[in-house]
């Protein structure tokens, strides 16, 4: 990063930023009546208007030069193609693969990983449909009314964001809860709201070694087993989202 901010193009951008600050947005529109058209983009239902920002054609040219200087285009292509962009773990990132269409195909290490990804997505959809249709029921036969996510960091914020973003479309018969720390107050407050007989717990941990998540899962599982002693009951009320299925099975899920 230090080399980047010392580069000539970065210095040019810095000077340009100081210069453009002296101009008001209204002046930029007076100077160029076509400004709104030049500094806006549209794609299907999306429309982006950045004409009301301190940006000129020179700004875009300088930013493009900066992108070229760090091979941004090639880095984006590497990310999308499954190249090893995570130098620490020597792994591809593949975030974008989760959103690739089923028929696209993405070969990584000689295998089409989209086949595996869409198999997991299909499994998720089937599970959701079972819950929505009341086919997935608790051990006692009662329908699921509450879903609790146990996770921390991205394993908490990701699902939480999805629930908030899709709130207008959610199944009104379901309530969602999130436990992300080991605070007794949060757990006790949750236990006052839910009924084990109608609750589905989702333990979310990529490695299935996250201390806080497993501690909460252990506490809840212990309380659950005090009420339901049959081992089969766990399958109706606990799920794991993880890359380490073996560890989840060892845990008892």
Predicted ranges, named:
Residues 9-11, 181:
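Mixed-charge, polar/low-complexity N-terminal
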Residues 126-134, 140-253:
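Glycine-rich phosphate-binding loops that contact phosphosugars or nucleotide phosphates
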Residues 4-9, 16-29, 33-140:
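Extended, charge-enriched "interface" segments that sit outside catalytic cores
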